[in-house]
Amino acid sequence: PSLCGSDEATPAIIPAFGIKHGGSAFVSLIQKGDAVATVHADKATNISEYNRVYPSFNITPVKYEDETLYISNTASVDELSLCYRFLTGQNATYAGLASACREQLIRNSVLSTKTVQVGDYLPFCLTLTGAVRRSFGPFSRLSALTTFEQAQDMLVRMKNKGINNVFVRYTGIFSGGTDSEDITHSSLLRRLGGSDKLDELYQYISSQKMSLFLDIDILSSSTGFSGGGSVNIKKDGSTVTPDNVLAEATGKTSAERTLAKVGKLAKTVSSVLTDTRYNSFTGFCFNDAGKLLYSDFSDGGLLRADAANAISSAISPLSTGNSSMTVNGNFYMLKNIDVIVDMPLTPSVAGSGAYVSVPFVPLVLHGIVDYAGEPINTETNLEETLLRSVEYGACPHFEWNYEPLKKDGKDKFYYDNTINEAAEFYSKATEAL
């Protein structure tokens, strides 16, 4: 759903809302229709003396553009359902609201009943970049930033500095690098070492009781799809332009990606399973599936609510018997997920003196999955980030390359520039948690 107040709508992770007043509170969970919901929140004014929070639903997709009104001939959802939980006394707290929401999500089989395995060491999430396309004037080429051998060398150094229980998310290792191509026609990049070196890396990771997650995009491609992609309500091809955190260093801005037909995901999943059956790794990291949700208006396409169910069902074979990771954390797929990275730990709207933010999502997920915020080495205030991570029960998360992208010594993604800070951060977080 989206969250809307006086400002424009921003994405919300959990389809829930509520109000606390004195010793009473309620929380409402949107059980059906959340994919097309917007939550409105308005504080009391001289016109309305009540604080208000309520949902609205975009039942029929509509778009107005170029003096033309486009209306779908199909409703987005067949049914709407909300569950209200009322709390009083000592349960009428933000923690109580989160607990009630978690209980209902587990009851609805949205969240798993499993709990996080408590080990001797705090998990440390590490995002590695395999290969990236770099611009050189009018030309561009794929450059290796972290080969499989280099990744092992980096992990050995981390181990020697006291960093244990590492969850490695390896991005940019298939065709196209970080500008990944259609996953059904992709293969491991030989310039990173190929299957043999990947297997050697996994053997080391497994022997050290770490985890290796291969990052994949199943909903988008930088090169399009052989059978065509999804289309929007205007019947134009659907695209998305993700942020490129390495843009400043690579000289390559973000590029449009074609969105896949969600109804064809079963074929995509089958291809991924076939192509990776001889590789050794812990599981997959679902990148775009953790962030994207869209309607497909092509023939036989699926609208948002049905698309959410289709994506959740599609990733099940990829996670069966294996641990899985995702990015950002779309809630409709969390039942199959063990680790979340890049989970928002700060408010999506600008702060003001009128309210304070509370860690509602971490309160709901704590103990069910391991989670981490955005990479700490991209933050400006390390001490503040440490305190927030400890308060929210989040794992440390760093994003590194083995090869520097810049030669000025200020490359925040070059691991040698921040590995000592990471070790110190990890030590403090381990003591606190």
Regions found by a protein language model. Give the residues of each.
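Generic detection of long, well-ordered alpha-helical segments
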Residues: N91-A95, A144-F148, S195, K412-I419, ...
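Hydrophobic alpha-helical scaffolding
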Residues: N91, R141-A144, R191, G301-A305, ...
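Generic alpha-helical secondary structure signal
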Residues: A92-A95, S99, E149, D196-D199, ...
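Carbohydrate-recognition beta-sandwich/jelly-roll modules
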Residues: P1-A144, Q152-V166
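Active-site-proximal substrate-binding groove within the catalytic cores of carbohydrate-active enzymes
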Residues: S6-A9, I14-S48, T68, S221, ...
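Conserved, mostly hydrophobic/aromatic
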Residues: M158, N287, S389
